[in-house]
């Protein structure tokens, strides 16, 4: 996965919150759906996820128990320093948030525990 695509425009209006609506669908505060397209694991320590904003027909919301175990958290919340804090209290770095030909992608990377 490239560190930052060279084509496209940077997006600065990041979602304040992303929470799991159903399996493989996250919803932001504006009711936009984000789908985790790629999950990358390196050396068991580095986890990255590429999220794409898509128009999808939403099913019924699911509880964490219904969603089941996942490498990804149930929720992310944007902090003032530009990082996301997840429901398990870990921090994720926003590597990039871009729009190419109307398609919006966001790459998040799990930060190591301090």
UniProtKB/Swiss-Prot annotation:
Subcellular location: Cytoplasm; Nucleus; Microsome; Endoplasmic reticulum
One GO cellular component term noted in the UniProt record for this chain: endoplasmic reticulum
A matching Pfam family: TCL1_MTCP1
InterPro entries listed in its UniProt record: TCL1_MTCP1, TCL1_MTCP1_sf
Keywords: Chromosomal rearrangement, Cytoplasm, Endoplasmic reticulum, Microsome, Nucleus, Proto-oncogene
One Gene Ontology term from the biological process aspect of the record: intracellular signal transduction
Tissue note: Restricted in the T-cell lineage to immature thymocytes and activated peripheral lymphocytes. Preferentially expressed early in T- and B-lymphocyte differentiation.
Impact noted for substituting residue 16 to G: Greatly reduced binding to AKT1, AKT2 and AKT3. Abolishes nuclear transport of AKT1
Main localization of the protein described in the UniProt heading: cytoplasm
Gene3D superfamilies recorded: TCL1/MTCP1
GO MF, any single term: identical protein binding
Function text: Enhances the phosphorylation and activation of AKT1, AKT2 and AKT3. Promotes nuclear translocation of AKT1. Enhances cell proliferation, stabilizes mitochondrial membrane potential and promotes cell survival.
Known disease link: Chromosomal aberrations activating TCL1A are found in chronic T-cell leukemias (T-CLL). Translocation t(14;14)(q11;q32); translocation t(7;14)(q35;q32); inversion inv(14)(q11;q32) that involves the T-cell receptor alpha/delta loci.
UniProt subunit comment: Homodimer. Interacts with AKT1, AKT2 and AKT3 (via PH domain). Interacts with PNPT1; the interaction has no effect on PNPT1 exonuclease activity.
Family per similarity comment: Belongs to the TCL1 family.
Protein name as it appears in the record: T-cell leukemia/lymphoma protein 1A
Organism: Homo sapiens (Human)
Gene that encodes it: TCL1A
